[in-house]
Design a protein with these regions (language model features):
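Short, small-residue-biased leader/transition segments that mark boundaries at the very start
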Residues: 1-3
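Short, glycine/charge-rich flexible loops or terminal/linker lids adjacent to PRPP-binding catalytic cores
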Residues: 14-57, 68-72
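Fold-independent oxyanion-binding glycine-rich loops
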Residues: 6, 33-36, 92
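A contiguous pocket-lining binding segment that forms or flanks enzyme active sites
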Residues: 46-95
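Gly/Ser/Thr-rich loops at beta-strand to alpha-helix junctions
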Residues: 6-12
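PRPP-dependent phosphoribosyltransferase catalytic core
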Residues: 75-158
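Non-catalytic interaction surface on structured domains
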Residues: 34, 41-45, 62-63, 151-155
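Short, well-ordered, mixed-charge alpha-helical segments that flank or form enzyme active sites
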Residues: 11, 38-42, 66-68, 96-98, ...
């Protein structure tokens, strides 16, 4: 089962479950947690397929900065029964420090025992866009690259 908090992640979860189903012939369910419980329509904090006892859950995130959404999401998952959160897939790892000097993603891995992976890191994004032209302008020029480097000198993980 895949789960993602907030509505932005629904397309990510749908795409992931469809690809897993196509590649491996697995029937994967997904759900999303809402910002707040609804008292009408499809009630509850979770939208989609219910989490059931024995489920292994992979959390899908669009971006991880400090790990706050994981701290909010894990209790919701665990409250559903005898479930096993096993992993976190992040579209973009911003590579920022968590509480200490390690990245937020590394802290999540160590704190919650989840396997974590990112599809792409900010370093890869910056490297790819540095001095690249798009519609007649350079996406990340020397000035912007210097500002990004200064930001990561201050807030980046070791």
């Amino acid at each position: 089962m895949c789960i993602r908090d907030r509505y932005k992640g629904i397309p990510l979860s749908v795409a992931a479950t469809m690809e897993i189903s196509e590649m491996y012939g697995k029937d994967i369910r997904y759900c999303s947690n809402r910002k707040e419980v609804k008292d009408h329509g499809d009630k509850g904090i979770l939208l989609g397929s219910p989490i059931q006892d024995g489920d292994k859950v992979v959390i899908i995130e669009d971006v991880t900065t400090a790990g706050t959404s994981i701290k909010e999401t894990l209790p919701i998952i665990k409250a559903q029964g005898d479930v096993n959160p096993i992993g976190l897939v992040v579209s973009v790892d911003r590579m920022e420090r968590g509480q200490g000097t390690k990245s937020a993603l590394k802290e999540i891995e160590e704190t919650y025992g989840l396997q974590t992976t990112a599809i792409v890191t900010m370093a890869e994004v910056v490297e790819h866009l540095y001095n690249k032209e798009y519609k007649g302008r350079v996406v990340i020029d020397d000035k912007l690259k210097a500002a990004i480097d200064a930001y990561y000198d201050q807030y980046g993980a070791e």
